[in-house]
């Protein structure tokens, strides 16, 4: 046996070292998932070499047979997994097994510490490290076509070594040797390995072979029998001596021939099940679908729903699609590999990251598509232009929407689905004009009439009042915020239902979804809100417009370019005023969302931010008193300051942010001082403030007038 060559030692990246420490030092009951993860990694490696060989058959010259082999060795206490996949170069071993953390490493540790199941490990891309659940030392030997054979080795002590391997050549692929912990030796038992493979990996697309020990009867002569017995005795040492002696006595009586039991090893294939998607859907149980789903996705939970169908005619393909129970942690990451649908051609795996197969908004759907018509050696470039693929994609979208409609028939199941994937449906409304109305049917919202229950747009339309022609909605940060908003006061008081849209993506939905079933969607936060009115209400509104026309002009002259116009409102009940935006600009909520974008286009803020309109409530005491003050003296500086204060407060209550919050705060503090009767022109010492506070307060409970009696000046700073 050749001497092992000297290797290089590397430290594990900090997050990986933490993860390994967590795996090793925490008790987990379902350690068996380590085998599922290693088999899944082997399957991925085999997929890669098979895909490369479609365009370059010479890639398989280093080993044509594609398989996974498991070898338990009780004497040595090791479990070995061998695959003939693509293998790893030295750089792959160093980077992938220790020095570069996957994006999921930290997320998985956080999930674990929050009480998540260890079996989630594969979903976070760190399944290899689950080997340390049962092993105290792992040795990985790997050979890639582009490099020499290397060995990676670690006992998880914070570092690993990589060295060239001059041992038995693999040809191509990877061999993982797990040195099993003393308390985990059950994983070397044939029955245990078979049980785990059957449970987790029976639908892997490559043969999984287990090296098993068997016995057979063999007829031998006396001399050969003696030789066999001697060998057995040496192997068993002194176990069962009396039984051996008795058998020896019997052997001596047989003078010519003897039948003996001979032990031998052979490979036994553990996954002979034919691909589940090629079978008739009526013959497949929910348990079988569940096992296949878990094998396909490494999910630890059952799927929520499944759609199994075939299309025949001009185009032949079969598909099996699953909806998971929960959203993946990295569902909307830009650099996330789209690998949820595996593409097969005539049962041969082609690729698992075919972006042309399904639109982005359905990227949570997992499954298999098997085409009879695509060429086996199709390249990525050809796929982009392929008409067959476009037809397959159209059918997949159609079947997914059918599946969601079926889910919607059961309220509870649909709520589970919607809580996880509502953003995807809304993204679909924004992106998929062809299926926009079908997707709109699937949307659910809270409304002013639905309480805690979700409500569909169809339900809303069904409850609309006879004289109601529009669908009213409001966007905002939270249910509590929009529920108590000034904008919904009049609409709710008149008995009209308002839809509450509180997710940032809702703003994008309504940019595309202008109407539903012939009813226009109208934001109660924008100008142009028209509520059905009778003649008396119309008459009162005209009178209010005339009565407050002068105040509107005064307020506009004070606020200048801060608002486009000031007008009498038909939407307010309890609030004195509010800020609405122009029909085609951003709402306050959209402006907030855009300001939060790290890579936003600042120039867009100027022309997309909606023009602000200040609406005043003619029935509110503050507005009526302000009108009287303005009528008495339109140059009253107190009126000017109060208008600015009202405007800034309305900005905040309407969902906008202040450009100068410091100035607004100073203005509020001055109002508080006025309310407490403190003369801000006189500086106060601490002693004076403590002894004279009571004397400074006015005798009556009323706050002092804003304008000083001796001077026609406001104590509040005049703001240009």
Swiss-Prot record:
Residues 227-244 have a biased composition (Basic and acidic residues). Residues 689-705 have a biased composition (Low complexity). GO terms for molecular function: ATP binding; ATP hydrolysis activity; ATP-dependent protein folding chaperone; unfolded protein binding. The keyword Nucleotide-binding applies. Coiled coil: none annotated. One of its GO terms (cellular component) is plasma membrane. A motif (TPR repeat-binding) lies at residues 716-720. It is found in: Cytoplasm. Keywords: ATP-binding, Chaperone, Cytoplasm, Nucleotide-binding, Stress response. GO terms for biological process: cellular response to heat; protein folding; protein stabilization. InterPro entries: HATPase_C_sf, Heat_shock_protein_90_CS, HSP90_C, Hsp90_fam, Hsp90_N, Ribosomal_Su5_D2-typ_SF. ATP binds at residues 41, 83, 102, 128, 380. Residues 217-258, 681-720 are annotated as: Disordered. Its main location: cytoplasm. Molecular chaperone that promotes the maturation, structural maintenance and proper regulation of specific target proteins involved for instance in cell cycle control and signal transduction. Undergoes a functional cycle that is linked to its ATPase activity. This cycle probably induces conformational changes in the client proteins, thereby causing their activation. Interacts dynamically with various co-chaperones that modulate its substrate recognition, ATPase cycle and chaperone function. Required for piRNA biogenesis by facilitating loading of piRNAs into PIWI proteins. NCBIfam families: PRK05218.1. Homodimer. Belongs to the heat shock protein 90 family. The TPR repeat-binding motif mediates interaction with TPR repeat-containing proteins. This is Heat shock protein 83. It comes from Anopheles gambiae. The gene is Hsp83.
